[in-house]
């Protein structure tokens, strides 16, 4: 089974990696950890509004900060995988987070694990929710992680009788 862990370096992304490491797969999964740097989102407001002269240096400074955060997230993901004895590859890409994750998502027999920041309805509307986008459009199962892993005491299995 192919497993894609999408991380942004937050505690939720790290928890997703921990959940995957603890899952009892029948066979050892082919794991990839993906971090997406979305720098185009910085320019998005200026595509529809007149550009204020002098903004570009600030945008470039913010791009450098975001890229540095991405490098830190990848270094932390590498260390976390080693500490969890989870073997796999690390992938860093630039683009829109949701669509890049969907492009990299395993087909049918795979799994995408992604953290959820727990945005309220207004924030989801204003900022967009990557986990919601992935859940709605992924070609495979999606594990949304909202809390750090702990031993499971109860499991609810819901079935509607369909093949899915």
Language model segments and positions:
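Small/aliphatic-rich secondary-structure junction motif
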Residues: 1-57, 84-89, 104, 152-164
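Gly/Ser-rich helix-loop-strand patches that form or flank binding pockets
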Residues: 2, 17, 22, 98-149
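Residues that cap or flank secondary-structure elements
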Residues: 8, 69, 93, 122-123, ...
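Structural beta-alpha unit
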Residues: 12, 38-41, 64, 68-112
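Short, structured motif recognition centered on aromatic/hydrophobic residues
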Residues: 26-33, 81, 111, 135, ...
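Low-complexity, flexible helical/coil segments
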Residues: 39-42, 66-73, 125-129, 148-153
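Short hydrophobic/aromatic-rich motifs at helix boundaries and adjacent loops
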Residues: 46-51, 70-74, 102-104, 141-143
């Amino acid at each position: 089974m192919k497993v894609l862990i999408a991380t942004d370096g937050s505690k939720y992304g790290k928890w997703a990696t921990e959940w995957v490491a603890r899952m009892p797969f029948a066979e050892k999964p082919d794991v990839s950890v993906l971090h997406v740097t979305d720098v185009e989102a910085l320019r998005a407001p200026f595509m529809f509004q007149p550009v204020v002269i002098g903004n570009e240096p600030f945008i470039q400074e913010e791009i450098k900060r975001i890229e540095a955060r991405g490098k830190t997230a990848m270094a932390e993901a590498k260390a976390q995988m080693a500490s969890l004895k989870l073997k796999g590859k690390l992938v860093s890409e630039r683009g829109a987070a949701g669509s890049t994750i969907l492009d990299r998502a395993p087909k049918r027999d795979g799994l995408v694990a992604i953290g959820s920041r727990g945005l309220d309805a207004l924030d989801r509307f204003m900022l967009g929710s990557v986990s919601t986008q992935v859940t709605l459009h992924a070609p495979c199962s999606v594990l949304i992680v909202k809390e750090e892993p702990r031993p499971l005491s109860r499991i609810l299995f819901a079935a509607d009788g369909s093949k899915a």
